[in-house]
Amino acid sequence: MEDPQAPTQARLVVALDGPGSSGKSSVGAAAALKVGYRFCDTGLLYRAVTWLALARKVSASYPHAVRGLVDEVELAPDEQGRLARVLIDGVDHTEDVRGPAVDEAVSAISAIPELRLALLDRQRALATPGGIVMAGRDIGTVVLPDADLKIFLDASVEERARRRTNERDLDPAGAEAAAILAALRKRDELDSTRAVAPLRAATDARIISTDGNRFEDTVDAVVNAIRDAEARRAAEPEPSGASA
């Protein structure tokens, strides 16, 4: 693991947003590892609540009941320090929350205003005291609007579907691949039109298009953006009255 630690005062809160399968989780985790930051994929919180709602047969039509599941969900660090393990009532359900049933239901659950509000303070607390890359769909616009650096990873829906198809080792001409493309299009529509915290790039975000990029190229672009922002922060004069 590379550990080129930046000075404490220059360690940033980085908001990394993007649509489904844009690479924000894998890219964000790799970039965070390179710069010695923590990493948090906030989408895991919504997936965990969705999995629990399915297991308990709690419908999205009952928002207060869904909101009541939040306290049972926890993110824990993995062996690399990333907040990437999902604990529900103390039991590891990391693999369960990535299943196809959750894929299908997570948009409807995530759109519940009461749930988004309930998770807001928790996500903000995770970002303290800095030195973190936080990935999601509304980090730079809602969760951390004052983040030191905002990045939005973008890619065409066809490119994102191709990646997910490859990840699952599916026939790109098969029915399952077509279903993935249709599901991503549906998720994009739901995420970008929901009433609360719709998917969009922050006005001050750096937009990185990943169409045709190698994974390593996108990671390097994010790392370079973080390093540039750290350098600018380190060069800022100390506030008047600060001790020498």
Residue ranges and their predicted role:
Residues P19:
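P-loop (Walker A) phosphate-binding loop of NTP-binding proteins
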Residues D78, Q123-P129, I139-V142, D146, ...:
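Small-molecule kinase domains that catalyze NTP-dependent phosphoryl transfer to phosphate-bearing small molecules
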